[in-house]
Amino acid sequence: MDLLNALVALTNFVIVPGLAYGSQLALGALGVTLIYGILRFSNFAHGDTMAFGAMVTILFTWLFQSVGLSAGPLPTALLALPFGILGTIALALVTDRTVYRFYRQQKAKPVIFVMVSLGVMFMMNGIVRFIIGPGDQRFTDGERFVISARTFKKLTGLQEGLAIKTTEALTVITAVIVVAVLFWFLNKTRTGKSMRAYSDNEDLALLSGINPERVVMYTWMIVAALATIAGVLYGLDKSFKPFTYFQLLLPIFASAIVGGLGNPIGAIAGGFIIAFSEVTITYAWKKVLNYSLPDSLAPDGLVQLLSTDYKFAVSFAILIVVLLFKPTGLFKGKAV
Amino acid sequence: MTETMKHTLLFVFVGVMILLEGMTDFLFFSGSWNSALVILNMGLISAIMAIGVNIQWGFAGLFNVGIMGFTALGGLAVVLVSTPVIPAAWSSGGVSIVMALVMGALTVVAAVMITKFMPAGKLRALVLAVVLIAGFFVYRAIFDPAVGSVEAINPALQGNIGGLGLPVLLAWPAGGLLAAGAAWLIGKTALGLRSDYLAIATLGIAEIIIAVLKNEDWLSRGVKNVVGLPRPLPYEVDLQSDPSFVERAASWGIDPVTASTVYVKAGYALMFTVVLLALLWMAQMALKSPWGRMMRAIRDNETAAEAMGKDVTRRHLQIFVLGSAICGIAGAMMTTLDSQMTPGTYNPLRFTFLIWVMVIVGGSGNNFGAVLGGMLIWFFWIKVEPMGILLMELVTSGMAEGSALKAHLLESASHMRLFTMGLILLLVLRFSPRGLIPEK
């Protein structure tokens, strides 16, 4: 019975939050990695693109809520999501046309692109703060839990409760669907294949008649959609605050690099590696150990390896270790 | 008009702007000498940071987005050097904390040695894991109780290990050293890889430094802040009660309160100018020397430089450390100016990316450009807010009183800053990528 309790506590505090956070990171890292693979630079504006997408979705959510539209037990934000995606796609395409295309034609060095993306980051950050303000916004509605701790305890008679938030379940399900569609697109459709060809060898792709501007356009559309979905899921699960999205940049980059920049499968794996490391290292293991160890061995302290304030340090440490020993990432990315 | 003439005029323009700030309250100027000197002082510090970044980016093409972290380390140096010694803290746990840190460092060194000298294989992985895990637990076992006892000492005012009680001016070079040490560690791992990786690694180290400063209360009181740091100049209140100062102020026809505040700020401005000029001179000499030419050769074509027998990675590490040290000095100066250490106020947009805008706008590769960019962009950073409010008042003047949109626009005007800075950066990168004062 005690072992079962330990298992439930572990699921409740580590596995479920880790899965949800990992899915959010994976979606974010997929966007970064696609930009890297096709446009060949690290997009520092990605966190703020996520914030922008989430913001547009929030505005539509509020509109729907005010006219009484709702998705029943699911959050209204799901209905607003397509509009958020459209808005972000528009922004991404306008940015590409006005900003990035010039440097592409000039064949500028990657580091110039990175710098330009800094400027874009500033402007997007400014726009988001200008429209919705720098504060915290909550926009989650609908049913709060798929299963709450109390019902779980009643059902099983265990001491430990297991709570699964609707947003957590939703995050994982959405991520699975999005990733499946993305891989189908990249592997089976003509456009997806041309994107992969362009990413593998630009010159060869150009020779075989692939239009680079079209490839770039599709990439931005996909990245905008991914960023919006990741941003909205993160906002639903935690809360929306522009600065938090900027800070997400570090774990997202860490995920993409750990998996191998430019490699979509690596981005997903990296997202979960980073998420689970953060959660397990900053989790206080006392409860789980108390259940699973005999009384004589039960720990006195919290058995927390690092305080939660250092979760950035965890993703960073993993990043450094990977850079030192396997600079191309676990799944063979493009970058050296 | 010659180049030199044009560049001098640009500097004159910044000077006139700051003078106008002091003299007139027309449009967005405030007409207060205090505010003009505040802008000037932070402008000088920004110029020093811009020189540091320019050395890294303009000389060597290194992309460092962790400036905030090095600045904060400079601030930490002020606390550690200048605050009074707390003997109780040292007798109760300070020594153990130092021992624990040494222990942690030794563990890492041992791990590095093991990877270097043992043959690769399962045995090495096992030994490595055992050393790291054992080291971590020993470290925590010494560290945790020591921290507890240090933080228990007079927690309302101290609760940290205190400083060395040395003159605060010594903290400036100390800040540089601290930042240089951090830069060496990060450069050792990330240099020699792709340029983007250095960017991401520095971004990460900056966040971690801030996280440490916020949470390690034994070090610099964390978010409880250290206030009332020693100052190199007298306090305004003391000046106001000094009869000879009051008399002199009266003979100039200024009231003692204004006179004392302006006196202190002008004193800082003088000190900062001296540091700025010294660093500018050194940077200029370095740029002109064979060493500077080698750096630019490496920047322009790494492969060719390597073929000529230059050790690119080592040179990169060297310049990365130097540039970061300058940022550390500037950070220490800033904390001295504020005479308080507030880790909560460090924000990457303000302390990292703004400095980048300064360097790019001023002209990367040119030290004078960096100084100009630092002063100019700082002036606009301060003044964009009143400008934005003026603009919004103009835009909304036709709207009905009390409409929600008008209220929102007026309220959000202060967020124009980031947007404007991004716009300036993009415009300069696009239309004048060499900046206001281009590299020669």
Task: Give the residues covered by each predicted segment.
Chain A
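Helix-loop-helix "hairpin" substructures at the membrane interface of multi-pass membrane proteins
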Residues: 21, 160-240, 245, 264-270
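Hydrophobic alpha-helical transmembrane segments of polytopic membrane proteins
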Residues: 88-90, 250-274, 315-325, 330
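Single transmembrane alpha-helix segments in multi-pass membrane proteins
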Residues: 10-60, 94, 98-112, 203, ...
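Membrane-interfacial amphipathic/re-entrant helices at transmembrane-helix boundaries
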Residues: 1-28, 56, 67-79, 106-111, ...
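Inter-helical junctions in multi-pass inner-membrane proteins, predominant
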Residues: 5-24, 185-190, 216-262, 279-289, ...
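Transmembrane helix-bundle core of multi-pass membrane transporters
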Residues: 102-103, 111-188, 215, 283-312, ...
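Membrane-embedded helix boundary and interhelical linker motif in transport proteins
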Residues: 16, 39, 45-94, 158-161, ...
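Alpha-helical transmembrane segments within multi-pass membrane transporters and channels
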Residues: 68-120, 269-273, 278, 323-327
